[in-house]
Design a protein with these regions (language model features):
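ADP-ribose/NAD+-binding catalytic cleft of ART/PARP-like enzymes
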Residues: 1-63
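ADP-ribosyltransferase catalytic core
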Residues: 5, 52-132
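Generic secondary-structure transition motif, activating predominantly at the C-termini of alpha-helices
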Residues: 17, 86-89, 146
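Short, surface-exposed beta-strand/loop "edge" segments at domain boundaries and coil↔beta transitions
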Residues: 32-42, 107-113, 136
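Active-site or metal-binding loop neighborhoods of secreted/extracellular toxin and effector enzymes
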Residues: 121-149
């Protein structure tokens, strides 16, 4: 697991995810419009890189979800997130061309978040990517074709 995860939480992640199968089809938003390593940063990684604002209430340092990379079993949550990015003038300026990417989880541990948090989006998956493996997992993703509506 990522070396920046506290040891107590690393143990919890390993226990919770033991035996969990990887997902063969997941979706994520590439906020910058391309598939690159930073797209696969965990929430904590985005906090360290000043991509996300440090908000201890929203991103508690003692919860395992803060250290995961979020992916979804369906595309819809990603489309909704992109709509939010485009509605905000500030975020639209920061992320002018966000896209939905599609791929599979690997090289880490996974948990369907609702198994831990009954209030979570039922399509949300926490994915803890192994240290140094972001460049490997990004090869398993493509830009998802536009929805035909």
């Amino acid at each position: 697991l990522d070396s920046n995860i506290p040891e107590k939480l690393r143990k919890e992640i390993k226990e919770r995810t033991k035996g969990n199968a990887h997902y063969t089809e997941v979706y994520r938003v590439a906020k910058w419009g391309i598939i690159e390593e930073k797209v696969f940063l965990s929430t904590y990684g985005e906090l360290l890189a000043d991509i996300l604002p440090n908000d201890p209430e929203k991103y508690p340092m003692d919860e395992i979800g803060t250290y995961s990379t979020s992916v979804y079993t369906g595309r819809e949550p990603c489309d909704k997130y992109i709509s939010c990015l485009k509605r905000s003038k500030r975020l639209k300026k920061t992320y002018p061309y966000p896209v939905v990417i599609k791929g599979k989880t690997s090289k880490g541990c996974v948990e369907l978040t609702v198994n831990r948090d009954k209030e979570a989006d039922p399509e949300h998956i926490d994915w803890w990517i192994y240290d140094g493996k972001r460049s490997n997992v990004m090869q398993d993703f493509i830009i998802a074709p536009q929805n035909q509506e």
